[in-house]
């Protein structure tokens, strides 16, 4: 038991450091929240120690321990739900990606091979000077266990935090924790929308998620609602304003609220309006957009296939 207690304190130090009182306070809170859950913490650790693609993920990404002491992923998530979410995600990965790919994605950047520092290149367009990468970004673990980062040059435009796992009916599913934009995003979004024939970058990152979902063997897709956003758990502390406003996007892409208002169910395929139903003055724009997206679908398929089982 003494060794377990020491381990929980060490985990907190590894996550938060010890340079300031604020960091020490977080270490204390992590310790107090985990020390009484020995069975669950040992289960969590044992899962990763026997994880075939890489038994050292927790050693290299200590931040994953924070999911055991903080109400992350979605509002009012329980410790049991978070343990299951993490285990289900990593179990699903084994059915999709090669062991070498999983190990690479969860390696710290300094251990990634040259050319893969940002993870898997999902998509790029040299004419637009844009790229999209799939990676594990430790700072985004509050909302997901994967991040798709959409960039214009070296500037972030949007990122989506996602995870694999089980849906509300126990089916293989992909979960979107959030989609967030970056500073100067509005100006960039206008530029990108024009170049993509009226297709907004916020919708494009959903397109990228859906394309990835094709290769992840999922049967459904869900998104966390504004009501379910993890940070809204803490609104009772005085933060009265909602910190996420994504419901309009989920509705725009065909999502519907589930019986649990914390989640939307999202169609796996994007609806494309038939050309004949589009006003004549906009048909050329839509036709070019659809042709562009079809080309991107082929590129994404070619980019990811070498990482798949």
Model-identified regions with their sequence ranges:
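Generic, low-specificity signal for short hydrophobic/alpha-helical stretches with a mild N-terminal bias
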Residues: 26, 75, 130, 191, ...
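Charge-rich, low-complexity intrinsically disordered segments
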Residues: 255-309
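Acyl-donor binding region in acyl/amide transferases
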Residues: 158, 167-257
């Amino acid at each position: 038991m003494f060794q377990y207690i020491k381990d929980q304190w060490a985990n907190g130090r590894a996550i938060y450091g010890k340079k300031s009182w604020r960091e020490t306070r977080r270490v204390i809170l992590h310790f107090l929240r985990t020390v009484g859950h020995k069975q669950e913490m040992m289960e969590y650790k044992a899962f990763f120690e026997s994880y075939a693609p890489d038994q050292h993920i927790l050693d290299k990404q200590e931040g994953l321990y924070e999911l055991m002491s903080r109400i992350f992923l979605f509002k009012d998530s329980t410790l049991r739900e978070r343990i299951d979410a993490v285990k289900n995600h990593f179990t699903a990965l084994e059915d999709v990606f090669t062991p070498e790919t999983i190990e690479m994605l969860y390696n710290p950047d300094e251990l990634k091979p040259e050319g893969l520092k940002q993870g898997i290149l999902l998509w790029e367009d040299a004419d637009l000077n844009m790229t999209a990468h799939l990676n594990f970004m430790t700072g985004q673990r509050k909302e997901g266990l994967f991040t798709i980062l959409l960039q214009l040059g070296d500037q972030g435009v949007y990122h989506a935090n996602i995870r694999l796992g089980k849906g509300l009916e126990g089916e293989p599913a992909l979960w979107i924790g959030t989609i967030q934009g970056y500073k100067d995003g509005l100006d960039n979004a206008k530029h990108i929308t024009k170049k993509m024939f009226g297709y907004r970058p916020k919708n494009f990152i959903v397109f990228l998620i859906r394309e990835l979902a094709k290769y992840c063997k999922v049967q459904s897709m869900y998104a966390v609602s504004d009501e379910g956003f993890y940070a809204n758990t803490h609104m009772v502390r005085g933060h009265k304003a909602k910190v996420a406003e994504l419901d309009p996007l989920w509705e725009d892409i065909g999502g519907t609220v589930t019986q649990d208002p914390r989640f939307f169910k999202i169609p796996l395929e994007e609806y494309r309006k038939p050309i004949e139903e589009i006003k004549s003055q906009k048909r050329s724009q839509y036709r070019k957009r659809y042709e562009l997206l079809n080309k991107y679908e082929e590129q994404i398929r070619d980019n990811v296939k070498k990482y798949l089982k």
